C-alpha cells in the first residue's frame, strides 16, 4: 500500500495527536500483514474498527485508496471491502440452509457456507424443485390446497415453468397470520413508522394482530363496494394505510393496480385505462420535505371512475371531492359499525391467479403492464431471504413506493420472512429520515444510488448512529464506488448488497451475498436458481468464468417470472430473436454485463446504451465512470453518441451536471474528458461536445432518459448546421 504519513492524516481531517495515534495503529496493521494481500490489510483495518462513522469521509477515502493503490483491477477484479467470517456465514439464512442440507445435496464436496456457496448455487440452478422445496419451508406460506408438485416443466407454453401447480392460497393472508416458523406472534411488531416533522416523537408500532384487523376492516369495506376480480388502483405514498389497502385488496380477491405517486395525470390515466381500474385510492396532498403537494387534483385530471381519498394527516380532507368520490372516513364507516367488521374470510385462489398489475417505467412508448400472480411474492421474498438475509428480528426499511416494483418486494419480503417493515412518512432526503433509521433500529436499509449521493453531499446524516444496520441494499441504477464507500462506512463497513433485476422477474437476477466477499458497485453472484450466460456480438455465449462483456441471456426456467403481458406480446418482448443455448431459448433482459477477474459482475447499462465510436462498441456507463472522476467540479455525467447531420461516424457528447457552488467551462471539460477517456479506455476516443446542464431528465423511478438527451443534441446540431 502507499505510505500514509501524519501530514496526510491531518489533511484528511484528524488533529495532530489523533493522526499520530492513527498512524501507529496503521503501521502495526501493515507490519503484521507484511507480504500479505492488500485485501488482508483492509480486512484488518475494518476488523479493528480503526475507521469510524464519525471520521471525515476524506480519511476513509485516503485509507481505502492507499491500501489498494497498487491493486491491479484488470487481473484481480474490483478491490474487496467486506469479508464474511465463517462464524457470521453460518448465522445467515443461506448459511444455515447449507449447514443443514449441504452434505445431503452435495455429498463430500460440501465444506462450509463460504467455500461451498458456488456449488450450492449451481445445485439450485440444476435442481430448482429440490431448492424450492427447502426454501418455501423458511417462509410463512400456508396453502389451503397443497401443490401437486414443486415444479412442472411439461407445459412448454410456460417457459418459466409452473411452480406449485394445483396449490390454492391467499398470499396476503400468509403475511398476516401468526406462525411458529418463522416465529411471528400476534404481538410481534409488523410495522414501525414515523411522520415527517415528528422527529423527536416515539416511533409508532403496529403489531401483527393490529395490522390484520385493519386489513380485514378494509377488506369488508371493499366487498361492500366492488365485485371479485375488479382492478383497484393505489396512487399514494407508501404509508401504513397504503400497505393496509394493498393487502386488503389482495386478501379480498381483487387486483391491485400500482401507480407511483409522482406521475402526472396523463401517466395515471394511461395506467387506469390499460388496467381497466374500477377505482383508485389516493391522498388529498403529499407532505414531503416540509412542503405540500397536491395529489388528488392530479388523479382527478386522469378521470378515474371513483376515488377513495385519504387525508395526508388528521381525519379531515383539505379539499372538496367530486360527486362520485368518497372520503376514507366514509368508506370505512360503511362497515365499521357492523358486527365482526375486523374479521374476514380470505378469498382463496390458485397460485397463478392475478393479484397485482405493475408497470415498466416506460422510457419509451406505452409502459408494459406486468401481471404479478401469487407466485411473484414467493419469488421476491425467497430472494430477499437468501441474498439480503431478511429474518425474524430484522427491521427492514427501503424508501420506495407501491407504484414501483420495490414497494411490493419490500412488503412481501418483510412479512413473509418475519421481519418488521419500517416506513417513514416523508422525504428520505433529510436528517429526519436518518433519525428514523436510527430510532427505529433499522437493521436492513435499502437505497438507490442517487439517494446515497444526496446524503453524502449534503452531510445531512452527520451525528446519527446507524450501527445497528447489518446490511445495506442498493438497486435502480449503477452505484458509485465513492458513494458506496461513504454509505458502508456509516455502519463500520457493513456490506452493500447490489441488486439488479426487473418487475417482470419479480426479483433480481444478479445480486450480492453474505457468504461471499463484496466489492463496491459490483455483483458477486447470479441469484439463487438463476442460470445466465453472457453473449458475444454474434449471440454466442462466452465460456463460464471467462472475463467478458456482452448482453446477458437468462435461462428460460425462471420461477416467478411473468409469462404474459397485459398490453404486449410476452414472447416477442422477451424471447423473439434470442439465441438457443443447450436447446433452450434464452430470455432477454437487455442488460450489458461485464464479468470481471475475480468473478464479479458489473452492469454496463442497457443494450441500447452502447455506442459505436470509430467502429468500436463501448458502453456509455464505462465512459461516464471515467468522466465522473476527471474533474472535481463534476457531480455526474451522461454520455450519448450522435451521428453528424451530414452523416459519418458517431460523435461522443458529454452532458454534465456540476456540483453545487462549482463553475466550469465546457471547452475545458471537453479536454479533460478526452484525456481521461484516452488514458483509461481507448486512445482513439475523443469527446466532440460538452454541454453543461442543471439536471438530467429522468423517469419517476429515476431511470435516466438518455434518449431525451440524444434527441436534444440532434436538434442542436441540426440548428447549428443551418447557421
Swiss-Prot record:
InterPro entries: AMP-bd_C, AMP-bd_C_sf, AMP-binding_CS, AMP-dep_synth/lig_dom, ANL_N_sf. GO terms for molecular function: ATP binding; CoA-ligase activity. ATP binds at residues 360-368, 498-503, 591, 603-606, 703. Residues 429-498 are annotated as: SBD1. It is an enzyme of class 6 (ligase). It is found in: Cytoplasm, Cytosol. Keywords: ATP-binding, Cytoplasm, Ligase, Nucleotide-binding. Both substrate-binding domains (SBD1 and SBD2) are involved in the substrate recognition, and are sufficient to confer the substrate specificity. Belongs to the ATP-dependent AMP-binding enzyme family. This is Probable CoA ligase CCL12.
Amino acid at each position: 500500500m502507499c505510505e500514509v504519513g501524519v501530514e496526510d492524516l491531518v489533511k484528511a481531517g484528524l488533529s495532530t495527536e489523533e493522526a499520530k495515534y492513527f498512524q501507529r495503529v496503521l503501521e502495526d496493521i501493515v507490519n503484521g500483514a507484511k507480504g500479505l494481500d492488500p485485501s488482508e490489510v483492509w480486512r484488518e483495518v475494518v476488523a479493528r474498527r480503526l475507521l469510524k462513522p464519525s471520521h471525515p469521509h476524506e480519511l476513509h477515502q485516503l485509507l481505502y485508496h492507499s491500501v489498494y493503490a497498487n491493486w491491479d483491477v484488470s487481473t484481480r477484479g474490483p478491490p474487496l471491502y467486506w469479508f464474511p467470517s465463517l462464524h457470521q456465514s453460518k448465522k445467515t439464512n443461506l448459511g444455515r440452509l447449507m449447514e443443514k442440507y449441504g452434505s445431503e445435496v452435495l455429498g463430500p464436496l460440501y465444506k462450509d457456507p463460504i467455500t461451498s456457496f458456488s456449488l450450492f448455487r449451481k445445485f439450485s440452478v440444476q435442481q430448482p424443485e429440490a431448492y424450492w422445496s427447502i426454501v418455501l419451508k423458511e417462509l410463512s406460506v400456508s396453502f389451503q390446497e397443497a401443490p401437486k408438485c414443486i415444479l412442472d416443466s411439461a407445459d412448454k407454453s410456460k417457459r418459466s415453468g409452473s411452480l406449485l401447480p394445483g396449490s390454492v392460497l391467499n398470499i396476503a393472508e400468509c403475511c398476516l397470520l401468526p406462525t411458529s416458523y418463522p416465529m411471528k406472534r400476534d404481538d410481534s411488531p409488523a410495522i414501525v413508522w414515523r411522520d415527517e416533522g415528528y422527529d423527536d416523537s416515539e416511533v409508532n408500532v403496529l403489531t401483527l394482530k393490529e395490522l390484520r384487523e385493519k386489513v380485514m376492516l378494509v377488506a369488508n369495506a371493499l366487498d361492500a363496494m366492488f365485485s371479485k376480480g375488479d382492478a383497484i388502483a393505489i396512487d399514494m405514498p407508501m404509508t401504513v394505510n397504503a400497505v393496509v389497502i394493498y393487502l386488503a385488496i389482495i386478501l379480498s380477491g381483487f387486483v391491485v393496480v400500482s401507480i407511483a405517486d409522482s406521475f402526472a395525470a396523463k401517466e395515471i390515466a394511461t395506467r387506469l385505462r390499460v388496467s381497466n381500474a374500477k377505482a383508485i385510492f389516493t391522498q388529498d396532498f403529499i407532505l414531503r420535505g416540509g412542503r405540500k403537494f397536491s395529489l388528488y387534483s392530479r388523479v382527478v385530471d386522469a378521470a378515474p371512475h371513483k376515488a377513495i381519498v385519504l387525508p395526508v394527516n388528521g381525519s379531515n380532507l383539505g379539499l372538496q371531492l367530486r360527486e362520485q368520490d368518497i372520503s376514507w372516513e366514509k368508506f370505512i364507516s360503511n362497515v365499521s359499525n357492523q358486527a365482526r367488521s375486523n374479521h374476514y374470510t380470505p378469498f382463496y385462489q390458485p397460485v397463478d391467479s392475478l393479484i397485482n398489475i405493475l408497470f415498466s417505467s416506460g422510457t419509451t412508448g406505452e409502459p408494459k403492464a406486468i401481471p404479478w400472480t401469487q407466485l411473484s411474492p414467493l419469488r421476491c421474498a425467497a430472494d430477499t431471504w437468501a441474498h439480503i438475509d431478511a429474518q425474524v428480528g430484522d427491521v427492514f426499511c427501503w424508501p420506495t413506493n407501491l407504484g414501483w416494483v420495490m414497494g411490493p418486494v419490500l412488503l412481501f419480503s418483510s412479512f413473509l420472512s418475519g421481519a418488521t417493515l419500517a416506513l417513514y412518512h416523508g422525504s428520505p432526503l433529510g436528517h429526519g429520515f436518518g433519525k428514523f433509521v436510527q430510532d427505529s433500529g433499522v437493521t436492513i436499509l435499502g437505497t438507490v444510488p442517487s439517494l446515497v449521493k444526496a446524503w453524502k453531499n449534503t452531510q445531512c446524516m452527520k451525528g446519527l448512529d446507524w450501527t445497528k444496520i447489518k446490511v445495506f441494499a442498493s438497486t435502480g441504477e449503477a452505484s458509485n464506488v465513492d458513494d458506496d464507500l461513504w454509505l458502508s462506512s456509516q455502519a463500520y463497513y457493513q456490506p452493500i448488497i447490489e441488486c439488479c433485476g426487473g418487475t417482470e422477474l419479480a426479483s433480481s437476477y444478479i445480486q450480492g451475498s453474505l457468504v461471499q466477499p463484496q466489492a463496491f458497485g459490483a455483483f458477486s453472484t447470479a441469484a439463487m436458481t438463476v442460470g445466465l450466460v453472457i453473449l458475444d456480438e454474434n449471440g454466442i455465449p462466452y465460456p463460464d468464468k471467462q472475463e467478458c462483456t456482452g448482453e446477458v441471456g437468462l435461462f428460460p426456467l425462471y420461477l416467478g417470472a411473468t409469462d404474459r403481458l397485459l398490453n404486449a406480446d410476452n414472447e416477442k418482448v422477451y424471447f423473439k430473436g434470442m439465441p438457443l443455448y443447450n436447446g433452450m431459448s434464452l430470455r432477454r433482459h437487455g442488460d450489458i454485463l461485464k464479468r470481471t477477474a475475480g468473478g464479479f459482475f458489473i452492469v454496463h447499462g442497457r443494450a441500447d446504451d452502447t455506442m459505436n465510436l470509430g467502429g468500436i462498441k463501448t458502453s456509455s456507463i464505462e465512459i461516464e465512470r471515467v468522466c465522473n472522476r476527471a474533474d472535481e467540479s463534476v457531480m455526474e455525467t451522461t454520455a450519448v453518441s450522435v451521428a453528424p447531420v451530414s452523416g459519418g461516424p458517431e460523435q461522443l457528447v458529454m452532458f454534465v451536471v456540476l456540483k453545487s457552488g462549482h463553475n466550469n467551462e465546457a471547452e475545458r471539460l471537453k479536454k479533460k474528458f478526452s484525456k481521461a477517456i484516452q488514458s483509461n479506455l481507448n486512445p482513439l476516443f475523443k469527446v466532440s461536445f460538452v454541454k453543461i446542464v442543471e439536471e438530467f431528465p429522468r423517469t419517476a423511478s429515476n431511470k435516466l432518459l438518455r434518449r431525451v438527451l440524444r434527441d436534444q443534441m440532434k436538434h442542436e446540431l441540426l440548428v447549428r448546421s443551418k447557421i
